[in-house]
Amino acid sequence: MIDVVIRAPLLSISGYGVHSRQVFKWLNERQDVNLHAQIVQWGNTSWMINSEYENGLVGEVMKASSNAETGKSDISFQIQLPDEWDPNLAKKNIGISAVVETDKCSSAWIDSINKMDAVIIPSEHVKQTILNSGHVTTDLFVIPEWYFEEIERNETTALESEKICL
C-alpha cells in the first residue's frame, strides 16, 4: 500500500475545491492507496458540510480527514498556491496549482516550485510563464484541470458525442 496525503481545499465551494475533489476521487478509487486528507481553507469560500453531496464524495473526504504525520507518508498531493506547499509533508511531494492567470510569476513562487519533487499545472501557458519567470529545476507536468468522467469510463451514450470536440 502507498501511504498518500492530499492537502487541499477539499470541501471548498470553489474552482480549487472542484479540482481537489477530482484528485481525491481518483486517489480514493485506487486499491493500492491508503489515503489521508488534510482539508485547508480556500480564501473566504463556503464549505460543503453535507456528507451526501457529490454522490457521497464529501462524506468520503470527511472520513479520510486526518493530520498525517509530517514526513511519514510516501507521497503528497498539495493543491494550493505554491507558497503554501510544504516540501517536507511526505517523502515525495507533488504540487498542483493553476499558479498564474497572467504572463508573470512571483520569484518566491519559483523558489517554492523548485522545492517540490514535481508540479502539475493546467496549461502550456502557465508552464511557459513559469519557465520565463526564473530558473526552474523541478519537472512541470501539464494536465488539464477537468475532463468528462464518462469518456474515461467509455460511457459515450451518457454524452451527446457531437457536442464534444476531442
Enumerate the predicted regions with their spans:
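Short beta-strand->alpha-helix junction loop in the catalytic core
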Residues: V142-R153
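N-terminal pre-catalytic "stem/leader" segment of glycosyltransferase-like enzymes
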Residues: M1-S73
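Structural alpha-beta junctions
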Residues: L27-H36, D117-E124, V136-D139
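Conserved donor-binding/catalytic core segment of Leloir-type glycosyltransferases
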Residues: V5, A158-L166
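Short hydrophobic/aromatic-enriched beta-strand-loop microsegments
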Residues: I94-G95, T137-P144
